[in-house]
Design a protein with these regions (language model features):
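Polytopic transmembrane helical bundles with strong interfacial aromatic enrichment
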Residues: 1-258
Length: 258
């Protein structure tokens, strides 16, 4: 247990340092890129009171809408927001994996690991939504838009919320674990949909790996991604250790009382 906690603390520290370093690189060494333009109708531009710089004439569409250059601030949020979102998908996948393991093996430890992974994934989803709102405001001039990526990600957050409500509404431990595992797997289907939807149907949300990132931008992005995953794994490991300690104490307490 001590080794597990020590490993988690080291991962947390290294992950925090990598994330901080990536954010500093984003401000001081990364090339400022506009990541293209954002397209708004005249009504949207007026409603959002946008102050974005109008894109050059050769980038203007012929359908009457207006293209604006994305401001530099959206690029800085990008180094924090995208790694959070990628980590949330990954941790959600871990939760679904342990849910499948529980249904096949019926071992309580798999349900515990699935629940804790869901807790960590939910934490990352909330952080992604907050930074995403800041990005949306900076990039599109509005706090929210029913864009396919945003909508499917919001659905994913709500499904996670329902997962915890479901767990708390069932008293029987075995039934609770079984229903929660089934729901976790069904809810996880939304994760790949949300991840790939910008590649399938038209969306304002940029596709990161098709954005032509310069090497000075790619390095801090990868560093931030690694750091964020390390932080996520550290939180997960600490929570698993805490839960295992609590379960051991309950076993000892029951043994003493009997």
């Amino acid at each position: 247990m001590k080794k597990q906690i020590k490993t988690a603390v080291i991962l947390m520290l290294v992950g925090g340092l990598l994330t901080a370093a990536a954010f500093l690189m984003a401000f001081y060494t990364a090339e400022v890129q506009t990541f293209g333009t954002v397209n708004l109708t005249k009504a949207q531009a007026a409603a959002s009171n946008t102050v974005f710089e109008v894109a050059p004439a050769n980038l203007q569409p012929i359908d009457g809408t207006i293209n604006y250059l994305r401001p530099w601030l959206s690029q800085k949020i990008f180094y924090f927001h995208v790694p959070l979102a990628e980590a949330s998908f990954l941790i959600f996948t871990v939760a679904a994996f342990f849910a499948i393991m529980f249904l096949s093996k019926r071992r309580k430890s798999f349900d515990t690991k699935s629940r804790i992974a869901m807790e960590v994934a939910f934490l990352f989803v909330i952080a992604t939504m907050i930074t995403g709102d800041l990005w949306t405001r900076a990039s599109w001039g509005m706090w929210w838009d029913w864009d396919p990526r945003l909508t499917t990600y919001l659905i994913m957050m709500l499904l996670m919320l329902v997962y915890f409500v479901l767990r708390n509404s069932i008293e029987d431990e075995e039934r609770r674990a079984m229903y929660a595992s089934v729901f976790c797997i069904i809810a996880w289907i939304d994760a790949p949909i949300s991840f790939f939807i910008t590649r399938i149907i038209p969306s304002q949300h940029p596709v990161v790996f098709n954005s032509g990132m310069a090497s000075s931008n790619l390095v801090p992005f990868i560093v931030a991604q690694v750091g964020m995953i390390m932080i996520g794994y550290a939180i997960y490991t600490l929570r698993v250790g805490e839960e295992q300690s609590r379960e051991r104490l309950e076993i000892i307490k029951e043994a003493i009382e009997n």
